[in-house]
Amino acid sequence: TRYIALCDYLKSEYGISVKDVIPEEKKPFSKIYQKNKKELLLSDYSSLETKKLHAAAQIAQEGSDKEIEEYLTKFKFPSDESKKLTKVALLNYCGAAILMPYKLFHSECKKLKYDLELLQNTFATSFEQVAHRVTCLQDPKLPGIPFHFLRVDMAGNISKRFSLSGIEIPRYGGACPRWNVYSALTRPGVIQAAVSKMSNGEKYVGIARTVEKGIGRFGQSKSILSIGLGCEAKYAKEFIYSENLNINDKSTEIPIGV
């Protein structure tokens, strides 16, 4: 599998051994890199897709750490912690690029009209990873649709947000309860598509679907999150989920606020 190939690459190129381990109950973790032992510990409670991303991100760190550190010197950070989090985000971006190479991924997105489940199957990644990756297709020479992306928990709190579509996503707390990213929580695993209209008149096509984090195991329940992805209505013909929607039917528009 690709996971085995990534682990083999880490071992052959950088001498890093990947070990799948069961974390102690009071010390949960998803990933730990023990630099002195050159061991990457990955939790057996993480999904295979998450493990692949961690392994790919470690490859990115080993191969591009100097370049990333130089890039970070261009910015001022309010704290060391914020700089550390930014570096983690960059490494995860690079890891996703290893799993879903830009040109190939862009080509498949165009061919499949951003069908996230087909893309998920093609690249053997998770629904959330694919949804996040489509927001990164912003090379001026080979651009994709400018999407917005958000992730919410069962309590309605936004834990991830990103917007290139122009829609405003609250920085703190939750968003408008009429967004389908919330109604999706009532129908787990089902993709919901809708046309939304903001108070300023802008229209968006958006989809939402729940995802499960981690893997099921005895005595523990998986956490449920909802992923929302959308774009301006003018891109509807390029977005497969708009095919059963009447973009011009005002009666089906869902008025939403921030």
Where are these regions (language model features)?
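Conserved binding/catalytic microenvironments
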Residues: 2-258
